[in-house]
Amino acid sequence: MPKIFYTGFGDKGDTQLGSEKVRKDNDVINAIGNVDELNSELGVAMQNVSDEKAAKQLAYLQNKLFTVGAELASLMDKRFTPKKEVGAEDVKQLEIAIEESSAMVPEIKKFVLPGGPSGAAYLDRARTIARRAERSIVGLTGSYRINPAVLTYMNRMSSLLFVLARYINKKEGVEEMHPEY
């Protein structure tokens, strides 16, 4: 890997994706960027959660997001094949984590306002970034063949982040607030 972290290649709005030169506002590049942003936010959340099991779950999600990003990159570079793909077992792992975390928080009967201690707040923000990443991937389905497990995985991830934020709030003794509308 080069020691220089700039090339000047992107100074005019293009980037390199494998062997392809593409515009930075390309829909695939946008989706990859949203997944990358989510990964960064999970890193911040992980450093701010008080629960070791939740932190380990976030580290797992971060690694899996690289698999999602690789799958998206392969849409534009046909010479690149990801070493791993998101599959039904990955989705099942998230569903189990959602069920386990949901069992530790009260049943939800109203909308919940985002926030709480920093760990929960970062998880709430990560959830919204996950939803945006999911929408940007859905937007690719009209032009590209997307692994259906990626779509399901991204949907479940935002659900898990919501439940984890609620769990952290409960663990920290923060009462949920509900919108008045």
Please identify what each model-predicted range represents.
Residues 1-181:
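Phosphate/pyrophosphate-binding loop motifs in nucleotide- or prenyl diphosphate-using proteins
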